[in-house]
Amino acid sequence: MVKETEYYDILGIKPEATPTEIKKAYRRKAMETHPDKHPDDPDAQAKFQAVGEAYQVLSDPGLRSKYDQFGKEDAVPQQGFEDASEYFTAIFGGDGFKDWIGEFSLFKELNEATEMFGKEDEEGTAATETEKADESTDGGMVKHDTNKAESLKKDKLSKEQREKLMEMEKKRREDMMKQVDELAEKLNEKISRYLIAVKSNNLEEFTRKLDQEIEDLKLESFGLELLYLLARVYKTKANNFIMSKKTYGISKIFTGTRDNARSVKSAYNLLSTGLEAQKAMEKMSEVNTDELDQYERAKFESTMAGKALGVMWAMSKFELERKLKDVCNKILNDKKVPSKERIAKAKAMLFIAHKFASARRSPEEAEEARVFEELILGEQEKEHKKHTVAR
């Protein structure tokens, strides 16, 4: 018997709800009350904040226990309640997959590059204005070769940008190598738990925990797509490894060629998606949103968000696929481990891949996911703009 049910009522659940049920209810209620969906409601932010606070308490076992026993006055987070919008993005921004895929920050590197070019463009414009002022002060007595000066300036700027991009790329590669090592270690731990479960005849318990984790991962941003990506990479790498052992390495020639062909296809798909989105964005930039009614504006913004999501997902997927392949290679090609053990690890990967590939969404969940991912994108863009302004 709980002292009060206000937080449970806000999320529309019973006091005996499981952690997964609480998270699902929070996502649904957060989408229903999100201020972006209620621009004309002055109380929208307060309602959204209330949903966030209810979840912050009920998702924390310690705070939930205090709330159930003593009520909400005794169940306040030590650091206070977080801002609902930032909390919403943090909870569903992909962190749940961290042990499987590492860093999943949409467009992080692209944003950094864009900021760098934007900053240097501003500096270049300011320098040009200063030069023009100097020229006018000389009363036209000293003339510069403007075209040559501009050309030299652009060459210099391009060199600086190239150096910074090379620096960013070097850092990205170092981060990637570190992530691959960490992810390989974590995947090895999961594989070991599977192998122990098989040997001890306790596979049912391992499967139950994995199924529960899959249910939670489905709630993440691009959750189902990430599960399918993991399944495809694990299955491909594991099957290729097992086949190479059966054919004494001869099949590696064919599987390697096939993998390279897939990589080329992925790169082509990424380029096509980017070009298609760019054309759509250019057309949309000609639209005057002030002339649209509320319904048309909502439809326009939804289309824009959808195009942006498509490009962001394509870029992230391409990068993730390469990272996951490196993780699998690190485990399966570790010569310090006997071949027989590595084959067993490959079979464990196939088991996990099968479970991930079996994940499904109902039509209602699919529509929820679409709306939800657009909201996540909106919050990430707001956060990015806020930090840009702060600088």
Swiss-Prot record:
Protein name: Protein CAJ1
Residues in coiled coil: none
GO MF term list: phosphatidylinositol phosphate binding
Domain J: residue ranges: 4-73
Gene: CAJ1
Biological process according to GO: protein folding; protein import into peroxisome matrix
Signal peptide range: none
Gene Ontology, cellular component aspect: cytosol; nucleus; plasma membrane
Record keyword Signal present: no
Covalent cross-link Glycyl lysine isopeptide (Lys-Gly) (interchain with G-Cter in ubiquitin) as placed by the record, residue numbers: K132
Biased composition (Basic and acidic residues): 129-161
InterPro entries, per the entry: DnaJ_domain (IPR001623), DnaJ_domain_CS (IPR018253), DnaJ_X (IPR026894), J_dom_sf (IPR036869), Peroxisomal_DnaJ (IPR052814)
Top-rank taxon, per record: Eukaryota
Keywords linked to the UniProt accession: Chaperone, Isopeptide bond, Ubl conjugation
Calcium among keywords: no
Region (Disordered), start-end ranges: 119-161
